[in-house]
Structures are given as C-alpha cells and as structure tokens.
From Swiss-Prot:
Native source species: Yersinia pestis
UniProt keyword annotations, A-Z: Signal
Lineage: Bacteria, Pseudomonadati, Pseudomonadota, Gammaproteobacteria, Enterobacterales
The organism's place on the tree of life at top rank: Bacteria
Alphabetical list of Pfam families matching this protein: DUF2057 (PF09829)
Signal peptide (residue range): 1-20
Name recorded for this polypeptide: UPF0319 protein YPO1442/y2728/YP_1333
Family: Belongs to the UPF0319 family.
Length: 226
C-alpha cells in the first residue's frame, strides 16, 4: 500500500468530515502560527481566508498596518496569541479597534483589545495572551517558540499543540488554506525512527474524528496486502 494513496484517501475524508469553518483574514493580520504550525511567509501572503475544522484552535498573529501619518509609519504589534473553539461556527473574523495614529498603536500594544466574531455576529469566548520577548530569545523558529509556550502554564497554552510535528502549508492568493485543528480528546503520534511511513499514517489517523477513523478502517480492510 503506497503512502501517497493512503494519505490521499485520508485527505479526502478530512475534507468532508473535519473542515467546518472559515477564519477570515484581512490585510493587517499577519498570521504567524496556527495550531503549532508555521504560517508566515510568502506562501500565505494574499490569502483571504483559512479553513479550520471543528474544535479548538490557537493562532499566533501580529497586526501590521501602515498609519496614515506624515511621514507614513508602519505599525507592528507584539505577537498575539488567541485560543478559541470553532464548534458550531461557520466563520470567524478578527475584529480590531481603530488604529490610525501612533497613539492608537501604542495603546493597542500596551492593551491589545480585540474580538473574534462568529457568523452570528456575536463575540466568541476566547483565551488570549501576548508572546513575551523572553519566549523568543532562546528559540530559532516560531514553531519552537509556540511548542515551548504550550507546555507551560500560560493564559493561552494548549498542550496538545506542543506535540504536533511541523508540516508545509501553501496558499493561492485570494483562496483558502485547509488546516486541521484539535478535537477533544486530542491524540498525537511523533514522527521519528526508521518506520516514518507507518508513523505518518498513525499520526493522520489519530487526527481524525471517530467516524472518519471507522470509515478508514472499513476501507483499509478491503484493500489487498502487497
């Protein structure tokens, strides 16, 4: 059984069973890490939304906005962390306060008040935090930073995301990017050692919900062993 075939079948299962809501993105939102996975860089640039499955999600982002001052100033907020549950929500948007002046920017950096608004127009219940500089000093990547953050007892820690291995993501400008999140209970499988193929299959199997796992097992039993 080829890994590509099985991975493709799992991806199809996920596309129908897991993706349940859309995180709307605006130009001033610089998405850095989603559910422990790196999202920054040119691969994400231009995407206007991010598809997430039903369950808990954690995002690390910055607000970057050119201020209409003379001369022009590019405001950049500290890294912000927010955790929310996407259950029974079709879309989520990050609602920022007005940031048009340096004073607005300083105020937001000091006290970053923002909301996550669901498709019903009401704010979601969230946990939020600001990533402090001491978290950044000893880490080489943002994935490493968030893994260390998530094993600690902080306001927006999600221990399940500390064990997720990194994976590449891509986006086409103006389109969406599918991303898996956490469904409770969450299980993880580390990818290491010689039998990476088997462990990768285990990892993706454990990310699926129980119904998807049952469907996959039924399908797998019908496949010939080569």
């Amino acid at each position: 059984m080829k890994l590509g075939l099985v991975a493709g079948m799992l991806a199809v299962c996920f596309s129908f069973s897991s993706v349940a809501m859309t995180l709307k993105l605006t130009p001033e939102i610089d998405l850095l890490v989603v559910d422990g996975k790196n999202m920054s860089g040119s691969l994400l640039k231009g995407a206007d939304s991010l598809e997430l499955n039903s369950g808990m999600h954690q995002i690390l982002f910055k607000v970057i906005k050119p201020l209409p001052t003379d001369p022009l100033v590019l405001y950049s907020s500290p890294p912000l962390i927010v955790v929310f549950n996407a259950h029974n929500t079709r879309s989520v948007a990050i609602k920022l306060p007005v940031i048009n002046t340096l004073r607005d920017g300083h105020q937001f950096s000091k006290n970053p008040l923002y909301q996550l608004i669901g498709d019903n127009g009401h704010p979601l219940s969230v946990r939020h935090d600001v990533l402090r500089q001491d978290h950044l000093n000893n880490s080489t990547t943002l994935e490493t930073v968030m893994a260390a953050y998530n094993v600690g007892k902080y306001n927006a820690s999600v221990p399940a995301f500390a064990a997720i291995p990194p994976s590449p993501v891509s986006a086409v400008p103006g389109t969406t990017i599918p991303v898996a999140g956490v469904n409770t209970p969450h299980k993880t499988a580390s990818l290491q050692g010689e039998n990476v193929t088997e462990q990768m299959l285990q990892y993706w199997f454990l990310q699926a919900n129980p119904e998807t796992q049952k469907r996959f097992l039924i399908w797998a039993k019908k496949q010939p062993i080569h």
